[in-house]
Structures are given as structure tokens and as C-alpha cells.
Amino acid sequence: MTLTALTDWTNILNECIVSIPAVLTVPTPQNIGKLIVILNQLLAFAQAGFLNQQQQADLTSIIKNLITILTISPLNFIVLTNELQTLVNNLLSLINLFVIDNTTRQVQTQLIQNIILPLAQLGPTGATGLQGSTGATGLQGSTGATGLQG
């Protein structure tokens, strides 16, 4: 992999680290559009000839799925996060195929892992319902053992 290609790859990953949390927390058309632009950059990278035909087909399919998911309204976060996880898994497997030194590989792996951190930190954010009524009192337990005599 050339230094220019590695720089492009790193820039795309860094943009994903910023853009994905933005879409997940504030899914505005602007944030979604920015992520689609980044995914198209990743698509161009995938088709630049660094990957074999099968790897290129797999990554292209995942990216196109993500772009499709992002263009459907309302945004389905479950489907989006599942496909983002698929993307991260694919990127992690690809980084091991790049001809780069181990230090660079570790840095790239960390960048890819940082893409998935926002997904792991997501929790339910919707309104909660009313608290249910208190349950019935349970049966009384058996009497405990007698203590030591003083």
C-alpha cells in the first residue's frame, strides 16, 4: 500500500470516527449527508485496486447497504448499527491484509475500533412508561437460628 493510499485510508477512518456518532446522536439530513459522502470516499478506495475481487465485492456491498439504509426515512437505528458493525468487522479483517509495518497496523486497528465505540455506548433514549404497581408481599421466611447466649 502506498503512503498516499494509507493517508487516504486513515483520513476516511478519522472522518468515520467523527461522523458516525453525529448521525447516531443527531440524525439530521446534514449529518447523514456527511456520512454518505465519507462512505462514497470509502467506496472509491475499495474500488481503487488495493483489494482482490472478493474483498472489493464484500466491502462494496456493505457500503452500498449503509448508503441505502441512510437514505430511508425514518432512519432505522437497529439496522444501521448492525450494518456498521459488519463494516467494522470487514475493515478489521482487511487491515490485516495490507502490507504495512506492525506499528502502523496497530494504529489502524485502533482507529477502526474507535469507529465502533459509539455503538457500544448507545443505550435506550426514549421516554419511559409509568411505573408498575407494587407486587404482592412474599411469604414469610422461616425463623433463623437462635443466637449465642450472653
Task: Set out the residue ranges of the language-model regions.
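Collagen/collagen-like triple-helix recognition
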Residues: A120-G150
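Alpha-helical bundle protein-protein interaction modules that mediate dimerization/oligomerization
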Residues: A5, I17-P27, A48-A127
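Extreme N-terminal targeting and regulatory segments of eukaryotic proteins
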Residues: M1-Q41
